[in-house]
């Protein structure tokens, strides 16, 4: 067995220029792994606590030196000599060291950094790619398949400096389409969307995750431009390409109602359901994330009952990758799809348990980035290894997003090489896919052996850990 020889954390910057944590772990066999922790902008009220220094003289009060120090002086000494293969034991030890329900003492960002590093170290010691190790270790799915990518094209709300309310406007290739071709669809739609905006003279830029942020009169205008973009492509709308949205509805609630630019009066929960029904019917929006504020539970139940047969009703702020909240959502039938963000719960073990529970209920899984990302591609391996049905890594733009897509592409290539043939890896699919697209027998032979992985190489470990101090209008249907 390998043993942890040292762990060292430091403060780095995420894609927004806001501090986050990087964690390096080295073992007695010479293997070294490095990982980093993302951070969100629109944060669910029930997420595990991300520890910030709140020192106005350092990084505008958003520093993470306290969390870094917690790793270097509290967590690391407890893990020296332990086998990284004992993930649950190590995660539970860190949870015990913290001793709070929301991980507020050590910080969920500190605990997750170490938890991810431990998983990477175990895979390296086993001489296996991370995704293969995860699949073999946890057996959440019997075989390895590529997920379907959800591509963010445009942003509004807290992710965009414009007058659009919806946080993410997404393009989703149908799951009968090969991964490589689906990546081509995402890239085509992203760049062609910009060309259509330019042709209309729309003023636009990109937001904090890299999606376009045009100034338009309404959310419906944006959908119309997306439809026009699809028409310029070789693909068929509602057969090859569908739309999705992240509403982030908690950011839209005012005095018990929801305000959208599509009409002057705010929407009641019942009226908003009709709005979503029209989005599905007019624009083939089959994926709706956080359609209501997380405590508007009756509205969640209603939309799941009314639209759940044809639409992914996705819980992000509702579930916050939390086991008990997911269990309650299953019992109360408030949604049918789990969005996974490991930093919402704080450990690999807890993340795996939530995925396992959602799977047992017949839900589908979406592995998601955060707005404040790093170049770490950990979640790409986690998505494939846990059999996620979808990934949501943002637009095919900006290095921290592209790193995840490139890792998926690398995994896809490795899987092809192991099978010795050109494959069409498909995810367990969408209810409106072509006949046969969701039949597991239609999939190519699963990968049963790990792709070749590099042998662990000896390297000079980091220094002995030392504690750090603390717009134009378009003609649109009446979607109101």
Predicted regions and their residues:
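Short, Gly/Pro- and small/polar-rich lid/capping loops
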Residues: 1-21
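Structural signal for hydrophobic packing residues in well-ordered secondary-structure cores
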Residues: 27-29, 71-72, 76-83, 94, ...
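Metal- or metallocofactor-binding catalytic centers and their adjacent structured scaffolds
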Residues: 38-128, 137, 182-183, 211
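Mobile "lid/hinge" segments at catalytic clefts and subdomain interfaces of large enzymes
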Residues: 46, 139-140, 144-210
């Amino acid at each position: 067995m390998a043993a942890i020889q040292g762990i060292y954390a430091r403060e780095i910057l995420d894609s927004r220029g806001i501090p986050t944590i990087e964690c390096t772990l080295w073992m007695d066999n010479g293997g070294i792994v490095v990982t980093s922790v993302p951070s969100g902008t629109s944060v669910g009220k029930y997420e595990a606590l991300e520890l910030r220094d709140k020192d106005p003289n350092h990084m505008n009060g958003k520093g993470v030196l306290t969390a870094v120090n917690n790793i270097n002086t509290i967590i690391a000494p407890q893990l020296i000599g332990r086998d990284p293969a004992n993930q649950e034991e190590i995660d539970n030890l860190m949870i015990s060291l913290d001793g709070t329900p929301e991980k507020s003492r050590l910080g969920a960002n500190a605990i997750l950094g170490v938890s991810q590093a431990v998983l990477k170290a175990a895979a390296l010691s086993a001489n296996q790619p991370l995704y293969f190790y995860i699949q073999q270790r946890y057996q959440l799915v019997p075989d390895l398949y590529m997920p379907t990518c959800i591509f963010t094209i445009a942003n509004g709300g807290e992710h965009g400096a414009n007058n659009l309310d919806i946080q993410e406007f997404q393009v989703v290739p149908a799951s009968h389409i090969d991964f490589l071709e689906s990546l081509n669809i995402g890239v085509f739609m992203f760049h062609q969307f910009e060309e259509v905006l330019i042709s209309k003279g729309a003023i636009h830029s990109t937001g904090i995750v890299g999606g376009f942020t045009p100034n338009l009169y309404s959310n419906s205008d944006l959908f119309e431009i997306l439809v026009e973009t699809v028409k310029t492509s070789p693909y068929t709308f509602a057969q090859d390409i569908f739309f999705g949205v992240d509403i982030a509805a908690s950011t839209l609630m005012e005095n018990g109602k929801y305000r959208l630019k599509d009409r002057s009066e705010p929407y009641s929960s019942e009226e908003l359901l009709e709005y979503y029904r029209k989005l599905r019917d007019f624009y083939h929006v089959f994926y709706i994330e956080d359609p209501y504020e997380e405590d508007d539970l009756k509205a969640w139940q209603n939309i799941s009952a009314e639209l759940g047969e044809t639409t992914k009703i996705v819980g992000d702020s509702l579930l916050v990758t939390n086991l008990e909240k997911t269990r309650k959502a299953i019992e109360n039938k408030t949604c049918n799809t789990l969005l996974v963000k490991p930093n919402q719960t704080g450990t690999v073990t807890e993340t795996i348990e939530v995925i396992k529970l959602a799977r047992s209920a017949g839900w589908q899984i979406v592995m998601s980035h955060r707005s404040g990302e790093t170049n770490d591609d950990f979640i790409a391996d986690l998505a494939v290894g846990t059999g996620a049905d979808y990934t949501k890594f943002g637009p095919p733009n900006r290095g921290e997003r592209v790193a995840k897509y490139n890792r998926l592409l690398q995994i896809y290539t490795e899987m092809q090489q192991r099978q010795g043939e050109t494959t069409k890896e498909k995810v367990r699919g969408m209810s409106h896919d072509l006949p046969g697209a969701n039949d597991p027998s239609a999939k190519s032979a699963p990968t049963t052996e790990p792709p070749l992985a590099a042998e662990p190489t000896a390297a000079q470990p980091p220094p002995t850990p030392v504690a750090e101090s603390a717009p134009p209008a378009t003609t649109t249907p009446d979607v109101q």
